[in-house]
């Protein structure tokens, strides 16, 4: 088991990005950005992937470029877990279709996992796990199978969980979680 010393290790922060914030460090339109969250942080941090402006949840920031590259490269197949609230009661055949793969305008895609969590009225909550990071992927997948996303939250990125982070806050990833993140990409 590897031990990472506090003063020698790179910085990895888990952020709960709120809806309405863009996943960049600057925005020409003046919208809230990730830079607003880390403005007082002594190190320069880079976002690992993105979440669209209408999606909330877990986003990682780091000063380790190699870690960021590996976490976002499809060959490492790092799973990302989303909870989506969609319109309608999801039919049983949708799971099979998503697991087998659907054709999107930028190529075929299959989810790693799909499960229905609950249905209340005309809203169904589903969990979707994918390892690719295409633009608005979960929203486009659910549109393709006929269930538009009403609300989308990323709850897990590899071994890192959102946990109880409030929107617009962050925590440092440490100890076993940090080691698991590096192990996931062979570093």
Where are these regions (language model features)?
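Basic, flexible Lys/Arg- and Gly-enriched helix-loop patches that mediate nucleic-acid binding at interfaces
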Residues: 1-187
């Amino acid at each position: 088991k590897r031990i990472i010393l506090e003063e020698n290790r790179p910085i990895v922060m888990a952020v709960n990005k709120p809806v309405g914030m863009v996943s960049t460090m600057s925005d020409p339109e003046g919208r809230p950005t990730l830079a607003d969250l880390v403005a007082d942080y002594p190190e320069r941090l880079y976002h690992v992937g993105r979440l669209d402006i209408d999606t909330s949840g877990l986003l990682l920031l780091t000063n380790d470029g190699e870690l960021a590259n590996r976490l976002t490269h499809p060959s490492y197949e790092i799973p990302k877990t989303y909870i989506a609230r969609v319109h309608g009661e999801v039919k049983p055949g949708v799971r099979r279709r998503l697991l087998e793969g659907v054709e999107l305008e930028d190529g075929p895609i299959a989810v790693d996992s799909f499960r229905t969590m609950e249905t209340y009225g005309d809203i169904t909550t589903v969990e979707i796990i994918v390892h690719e990071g295409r633009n608005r992927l979960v929203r486009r997948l659910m549109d393709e199978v006929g269930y538009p996303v009403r609300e989308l939250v990323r709850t897990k990125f590899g071994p890192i969980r959102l946990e109880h982070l409030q929107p617009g806050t962050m925590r440092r990833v440490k100890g076993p979680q940090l080691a698991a993140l590096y192990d996931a990409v062979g570093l």
